[in-house]
């Protein structure tokens, strides 16, 4: 077979089709080791089950991008979403365990429950809710926005934070910022800091360049260095 438009629906779905083309597939082993990629989609149970060789990907439920090889546009959406995707590229991911152990990083995003869950090997990151940057390893450019925000991110890089527990005990520091609620929430291994509202530099440890602006501003900062502060 030499591919072209494809669809397929159940059982072993695109059972080792060669050579790819437009793809879709829907149930059980959906893109069942399709070779050689092209525009993909896949929808249910083992969705992109070890699709080879990548291209535009999507996948939607159950094991979603289940060990996809070799990368491509990625997206994901539900259950295990980017489940152990190998080897990275475009990424996104949306619900429950989004970037569950994605390997090997690249452009990232992620949105819900355990967001960037233990993503391995970092790259451009973002993440928005749930456990946000849930123990991301190994860092790169970070952001993170709600709930546990940078939840114990490892290992640092450019950080930001924004809401709820924001830089929540981030490890190991680097360029920091953080904006609301628990802000620099006992950040660990400091570096350039900033922080802005609610508990601002809340007992930041271990310091470095500081700043802080509102509400509890330099809230009992520990341990010193360059400081500033403006509001309460």
Label every PLM stretch briefly.
Residues 1-232:
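Glycine- and small/polar-enriched repetitive beta-structure motifs of secreted/surface proteins
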